[in-house]
Amino acid sequence: MLMPKRVKYRREHRGKMRGRAKGGTEIAFGEFGLQAQAASWITNRQIEAARRAMTRYMKRGGKVWIKIFPSKPYTAKPLEVRMGSGKGAPEGWVAVVKPGKIMFEIAGVSEEVAREALRLAAHKLPVKCKFVKREENGGESNEN
């Protein structure tokens, strides 16, 4: 599972997910990518499930880059506990994803294999996604 090695503070505010992604909106390493269409928290378990789905379908061919990292802790109080008495215990880690962010990239496989692998990965994620591929001049073309 992905998680930070150490953090300065164990608990964080939830924060807002306004606007579009500032960086990471273009394909940097691979040939094909999976782009978020909405804002969401993505847990380290969801990232791992998507990675496994992609690599299983590609059968050890190609390379996968994970472009998001769960660096934000989220907390939860136990069941049937009254309100108050402090913030809950850290429960897990999430990556904050905004619209336009490229979450995964793939290289070394055909477009059909990449499209299906990224479709399987998108089913594991709580956010609507779009398949994008790199253009010759370095950007990406948005194809569905």
Curated annotation (Swiss-Prot):
The keyword Ribosomal protein applies. Signal peptide: none annotated. Pfam families: Ribosomal_L16. One of its GO terms (cellular component) is cytosolic large ribosomal subunit. GO terms for molecular function: rRNA binding; structural constituent of ribosome; tRNA binding. GO terms for biological process: translation. The keyword rRNA-binding applies. Keywords: Ribonucleoprotein, Ribosomal protein, RNA-binding, rRNA-binding, tRNA-binding. NCBIfam families: rplP_bact (TIGR01164). Part of the 50S ribosomal subunit. Binds 23S rRNA and is also seen to make contacts with the A and possibly P site tRNAs. Belongs to the universal ribosomal protein uL16 family. This is Large ribosomal subunit protein uL16. It comes from Bacillus cereus (strain ATCC 14579 / DSM 31 / CCUG 7414 / JCM 2152 / NBRC 15305 / NCIMB 9373 / NCTC 2599 / NRRL B-3711).
